[in-house]
């Protein structure tokens, strides 16, 4: 068993098995009694929404059935106007899926705070958690980023690697689950790029990611 922990990144489209692979890495770390930190580039978006909805941060089980259903189901949002009509004083509502709320919030705040706002948020959160560990735990700790969706997120994990002195391994996920989906949202383009290169489920794409970031791919 290698004592020094690593940094793992997972890339794949919707429903490609990223959560399953992250869970497998968690189980493996637990079997080796190795500490683990989960880095989630969507966590800052979720906490922003939870603060808007409830007034405080709320821990969400992202592997649970409730969260999966919330992303798929639509909610009614009351508006002080009627969409697509010039009637500003009429109350109306719009239906929005949980996944759409996450995507729209993430993209809009990027326009305000920079394209890498969530990458910076997550890298800081992970590095701060790692820095609070004992020297032994920090050395052995694995860090898992369950979903890389943008160049800036990949750049962020290499920055975390510099701060922690850990090796990076990035794997491609392409398991075709019942929820497997190819769509044109900007957050899916990163994974689709590697799909277009012919990458298969389980491939180590670390060097391909580096080449993409260096502009060589």
Question: Residues of each region from the PLM?
Answer:
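Extreme N-terminal, non-catalytic leader segments
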Residues: 1-9
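ATP-dependent NMP and nucleoside kinases share a basic, alpha-helical "lid"
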Residues: 101-104, 121-189
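ATP-dependent small-molecule kinase phosphotransfer cores
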Residues: 43-143
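Walker A/P-loop
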Residues: 19
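P-loop (Walker A) phosphate-binding loop of NTP-binding proteins
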Residues: 13
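Post-Walker A helix-loop "phosphate-sensing" segment adjacent to the P-loop in P-loop NTPases
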Residues: 27-38
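ATP-binding Walker
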Residues: 16
């Amino acid at each position: 068993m290698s004592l020094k922990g690593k940094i793992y990144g997972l890339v794949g489209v919707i429903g490609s098995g990223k959560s399953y692979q992250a869970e497998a890495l968690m189980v493996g770390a637990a079997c080796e009694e190795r500490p683990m930190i989960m880095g989630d580039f969507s966590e800052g978006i979720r906490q922003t929404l939870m603060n808007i909805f409830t007034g405080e941060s709320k821990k969400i089980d992202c592997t649970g059935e409730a969260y999966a259903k919330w992303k798929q189901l639509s909610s009614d949002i009351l508006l002080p106007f009627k969409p697509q009509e010039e009637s500003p004083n009429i109350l109306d509502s719009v239906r929005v899926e949980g996944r759409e709320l996450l995507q729209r919030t993430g993209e809009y705040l990027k326009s305000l705070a920079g394209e890498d706002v969530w990458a910076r948020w997550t890298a800081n959160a992970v590095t701060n958690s790692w820095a609070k560990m004992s020297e032994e735990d920090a050395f052995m700790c694995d860090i898992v980023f369950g979903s890389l969706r943008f160049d800036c997120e990949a750049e962020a994990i290499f920055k975390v690697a510099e701060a922690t002195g850990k090796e990076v391994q990035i794997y491609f996920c392409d398991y075709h689950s019942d929820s497997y989906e190819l769509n044109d949202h900007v957050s899916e383009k990163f994974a689709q790029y590697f799909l277009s290169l012919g990458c298969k489920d389980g491939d180590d794409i670390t060097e391909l990611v580096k080449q993409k970031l260096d502009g060589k791919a």
